[in-house]
UniProtKB/Swiss-Prot annotation:
Taxonomic placement: Bacteria, Bacillati, Bacillota, Bacilli, Bacillales
SUPFAM superfamilies recorded: P-loop containing nucleoside triphosphate hydrolases (SSF52540)
Protein name according to UniProt: Guanylate kinase
Keyword terms, alphabetized: ATP-binding, Cytoplasm, Kinase, Nucleotide-binding, Transferase
Family stated for the protein in its record: Belongs to the guanylate kinase family.
Species for this entry: Staphylococcus aureus (strain COL)
Gene Ontology CC annotation, any one: cytosol
Gene3D superfamilies xrefs: Guanylate Kinase phosphate binding domain (3.30.63.10), P-loop containing nucleotide triphosphate hydrolases (3.40.50.300)
Length: 207
């Protein structure tokens, strides 16, 4: 049978919820076959991050030039920094039959939903907003004012859960990883995704 087109898997949630940690755990699993779509950002690189691995880090001017050239599936400005997803890599990789894993902010996910309505949208939620605050404080990288700004934004983002297909609570990283992998596996078994291939197989068998 023909190769099935890959899924676009969109993981997003509030800043500090642990999206990057869960994503890294997924890709450390030897059974993972997803292709990671690296986002582009204008924010400062954090300790331990690598350009071209965690993000493509760009200046604001360079990022805005790419916006004008329509080179993003989505982009958003969040807490003073741009984040965006380069478009061509995602399309080409899905056409080759690979699942593409996209870790982005909630505003960006809204734009992806418009352009890729058949994508799989997963919201990574904190056990509570207080737990989220503790994670942000624990980073030790931001002022109290910036942390409060992120908490206020998180409240709005939690109210936007209805844009997503699934919600996974990140109460423990390994559990969150397993839940996401199970969701993706089940999505591949949906009738809508496999029916056309089997209809073609049946027609060919009748010839």
């Amino acid at each position: 049978m023909d190769n099935e087109k890959g899924l676009l898997i969109v993981l997003s949630g509030p800043s500090g919820v642990g999206k990057g940690t869960v994503r890294k755990r997924i890709f450390e699993d030897p059974s993972t076959s997803y292709k990671y779509s690296i986002s582009m950002t204008t924010r400062q690189m954090r300790e331990g991050e690598v350009d071209g691995v965690d993000y493509f880090f760009k200046t604001r001017d360079a990022f805005e030039a790419l916006i004008k050239d329509d080179q993003f599936i989505e982009y958003a400005e969040y807490v003073g920094n741009y984040y965006g997803t380069p478009v061509q890599y995602v399309k080409d990789t899905m056409d080759e039959g690979h699942d593409v894993f996209l870790e982005i902010e909630v505003e960006g996910a809204k734009q992806v939903r418009k352009k890729f309505p058949d994508a799989l949208f997963i919201f990574l939620a904190p056990p509570s907003l207080e737990h989220l605050r503790e994670r942000l404080v624990g980073r030790g990288t931001e002022s109290d004012e910036k942390i409060q700004s992120r908490i206020n934004e998180a409240r709005k983002e939690v109210e936007m859960m209805n844009l997503y297909d699934y919600v996974v609570v990140n109460d423990e990283v390994e559990l969150a990883k397993n839940r996401i992998q199970c969701i993706v596996e089940a999505e591949h078994l949906k009738r809508e995704r496999v029916e056309a291939k089997y209809r073609k197989m049946i027609l060919e068998a009748k010839k």
